[in-house]
Amino acid sequence: MIARALVAAAILVVAVAGSSGAALPPDIVDRVERYLNDIDTLKARFTQIAPDGRFSEGRVYIDRPGRLRFEYEPPERMLIVATDWRVVMHDPRSDQTTTVPVERTPLGLLLEDDIRLSGDVTIRGLAEINDELHLTVFQTDEPGLGQLELVFGMRPLELRRWQVLDAQGKTTQVNLEDVELNVPLESGLFSTARLR
């Protein structure tokens, strides 16, 4: 149960952004799309705050399109891998493995080949708060899957964290540190062979 909550929290998405009164540049959505589409790979440390307040950390790897890996450090030690447009989650403590289609997760947006913040995705909130851009989106055809709030530094534009508001109304926050963009990643990181 803990594994599923962590997985859902790590993959699903976020709270509605408030308003700061700051005027946003008219092209900000286009700038965010360009920024996200310019990311071929991402490697970072993460800290996660689960809905129950538990804290965990580890490493995240993204290789667009379609591949993602979350490695949780002890005591969690969970592993989440997205490849072939499916997400495989393995909890070694319970020895349980769960598989879901990427498109059933709000974080699937970050794995798309061509990221668009319209059409399949609807923007629910857009605000600048304390020099950060908060962009909240949900899947247009599946609003019940949850929301994803992406938080960017503004100067320069950079992804700092995201929050997932899942279908049960629970929020999980993931903060990124030591982010490296467009660096080579070993393809073995995204193998699910040992997870089943």
Can you annotate each of these PLM segments?
Residues 34-53:
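A short, Trp-centered hydrophobic/proline-enriched beta-strand micro-motif
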Residues 59-109, 172-173:
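An acidic-aromatic
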